[in-house]
Amino acid sequence: MFISTRKFAAVRAFGGTFRSKSTNEFGRHLFKGAVAAPYLEWRGLSRNTLDTVDWTRDPVMTDKVAGAVLDWARDNGASVYCHWFQPLGAAGVRHGQSAQVQNRMFEFDKDGNQIWEFKGKNLLQGETDGSSYPTGGLRKTHTAGGYLGIDPTSPIFLRDDTVFIPSFLVSYHGYALDEKTPLLRSVDAISVHGSRLLKKLGYDVKGLTCNIGLEQEFFLVPRDPYNTRMDLQLTGRTVMGADAPRGQEMCDHYMSPPSVSGAPYSCMKEIQEQCFKMGIPLKTRHREVAPGQYEFAPLFGFVTTQIDQNLMVMQIMDEVAPKHGLTCLVAEKPFNNVNGSGKHNNWSISTTDGVNLFNVNQLAAKSGSREIFPVIMASVIKAVDEYGDLMRMSIATPGNDFRLGACEAPPAIMSVYLGDSMTHYMESYMHGSIEPYDPSTKVLNMGHTLPSIVIPNEDRNRTSPFPYGGHRFEFRAVGSAQNTSLVNTVLNTIVANSFKEFADKIEAGASPREVTQDALKKHWRVVFNGDGYDPACQEELTKRGLWRIDSCVDAINTYVSPKNTALFEAMGVFAPDECAARRNVQLQHYVGTVEMELKCMLDMINQHVLPSMRDANVGYVTELEEAVATLRRVWDDVHHTEDLGEKAAKARSLRLETMVEARCICDSAEKVCPAHLWSIATYKDLLFIDQTLS
């Protein structure tokens, strides 16, 4: 029987008058644009007031903005505000490691009556104990002042009953005690020096800014098995565990369809819905390469806003997952012998009116010159070649020691991928042949039945740490648990330095073309389009003299090399004392991570593995007891080492050698121990979530 679709069409018109609940609520908890406009206008302000930082310098306007925020908060059931900031060392066990001080937006009079009060001074500034966060020696208990100030470049948002005010944290003497302050300084540096360079090239702009897009990878595992694993609970990583019978052998996890009735699907939907309310545009979701691994990716945006949003995404993932019987793991390498997780940092520079400096056609159209683009590209090439050690330092997290160069992430050798067409263009320019670069798309003819496919001008290179992807560079080596403020601080700073040096030379009389060609000839070695996973290619890059720092500890120490402290100081990003402090914080973080992992391993061996082995009578007991004694002896040496750099180096050796030897014994025992006697969840229990929760 034929059933007409007319009734359906009348209710839900073709072309989509229907909108989902989540899209209808997009940005309703973000104090920006159409949401903020009526509250600002009610207070006599323009709907564009928040578009600049000028309002923060006018006490009258500040009070009015605070009043508008209060009205909006009350209308949404909020009564608490916090200055939300990013302490030093913001990566690791606590996802992103943000912090906040919460205060009520009302007081009480002598009769107990509630009085709503939220003034400009409350909005602009807060205070906290600066000595209770990692400071690397910049603050002590008897000199503990820490001062919070609003970051007007990142919008205020609301979650539950709390208004979040994105903020920076500095000491009594103005030292940066957080991750955001140097990031904002680096944006200023690239704007000042980049604008000066562009002016020398005949393109007058008001300023520059940086945009990023962060691809967030993570694992979702069943919560009940997770609760049997002390290592996952306390460190985010398994310190033991035999491989499951199935892993990535069939390459059948990546992009495979999620089960719409499964817990991961409903969990990811709720995460997106919560993010949409706060104006976080999570556009893409999909399965990743490893079993139980997934990814979210947002639309691009201003660097500080994107980082703030990513920190909140990690927090929301962490909080929503248990509601669906799951746990979210964002550590770089939670499981052995399957892919780890990263956070690809897609980075670009644009003028304040939206012209992307990496988009050759857009830049040429707006500036009237095709001579600017090769100068910009040469600036990046120069920066990576000179300061690849700083790029490596910016991704030197404990988890990345297991991930980089393991055929799942780029090697720890800093090179640049340009693609064939761009390489030919820049190489020709370097040798004096000025050819036009027209990155037009290509069309693949698929025959008579299938439609033609339009593809980009350049192929993808997933083995490069820093490939050019058309209009952006993608830093692919970033760890999944990282706050990417330091990553982008480094990128901005090293390129700002190139801009400054180019502008200085042009001002001294050199032609832009001469400056660019000289830089390309000097730094062309850093351009590499080959297979970064190939050991022969890695050997070639090492012979070229590129920055190769395999150890995270060695990379962290480059923070205080003379050339790097001089760079940061010259660009106004870090004082030398701030560099030294951050180096100390990162090394302490590394040692602390190893200590926690070791203690978990020892407890799990003594409380679970050895009893199971004895009950099952499977052998290995003597070997494991000897391994435990070795672990304790080596850690005792680490613990009593005074020099922090030496201590971290010893901790790394303990982690990657001594602990691995103990793990091998545990994993061998697991393989032969009867399942009913093994009290720790296995990789099979944790990774194959569709089978576990079906």
Task: Give the label of every model feature segment.
Residues 62-63, 86-87, 121, 287-288, ...:
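Residue-level "edge-of-site" marker
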Residues 78, 82-84, 307-323, 349, ...:
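Hydrophobic/aromatic-rich, well-ordered segments within soluble, folded domains that form packed cores
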Residues 90-117, 123-125, 130-131, 136, ...:
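Short linear, low-complexity motifs centered on an aromatic residue
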Residues 524-694:
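C-terminal amphipathic alpha-helical interaction region
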